[in-house]
């Protein structure tokens, strides 16, 4: 079973949690896109749902495949969000944002009664940090913000490069018009403390540490999908 097949297995298992009439948060990234494709098949067969996308990319795919969409302002309280992750640990702390949609993903997840994470087994880690941590920043004062993050990292005993994410024609811009610094901190021993400290830096819009948001992770491997519950 290759990586895409494992993503599809996880998405199939997540789809079993979707019920008729649900208001769904729909994530961003390659695994979430497999879920959208499967969801679209169910919608075509008569399933009634309304989705809130976490990115313009996800919105375009949903429109293309016929998944009904609303804005979060129209549906401010959601039943369930299904999204992928770049890393997930044993208590369902996550690193997200590899697809560049971390701010909207976190807003949508927080507006949901439940969040289910879907991923292949390569995303499960003992300690967060091997995947660079995305930090979304305001373009204004970006150098000052970067210095503040570097000082915070040093105080926290973290080292590693901060890399400005780029696209084909320059700096990567999020759907909200922000920049992303990818922080290669390595092992993050206290994710909660780092999350709190990052939130105190004025130029930091959001970060990719998702803590106390996911209630279930569906992890796919060669033997099929397994469930990880929040503890």
Curated annotation (Swiss-Prot):
It comes from the Bacteria. It holds the Pfam family Rib_5-P_isom_A. Pathway: Carbohydrate degradation; pentose phosphate pathway; D-ribose 5-phosphate from D-ribulose 5-phosphate (non-oxidative stage): step 1/1. GO terms for molecular function: ribose-5-phosphate isomerase activity. Gene3D superfamilies: 3.30.70.260, 3.40.50.1360. Keywords: Isomerase. GO terms for biological process: pentose-phosphate shunt, non-oxidative branch. The keyword Protease does not apply. Signal peptide: none annotated. Coiled coil: none annotated. Its EC number is 5.3.1.6. The keyword Isomerase applies. Belongs to the ribose 5-phosphate isomerase family. Homodimer. Catalyzes the reversible conversion of ribose-5-phosphate to ribulose 5-phosphate. This is Ribose-5-phosphate isomerase A. The lineage of its organism: Bacteria, Pseudomonadati, Pseudomonadota, Alphaproteobacteria, Hyphomicrobiales. The gene is rpiA.
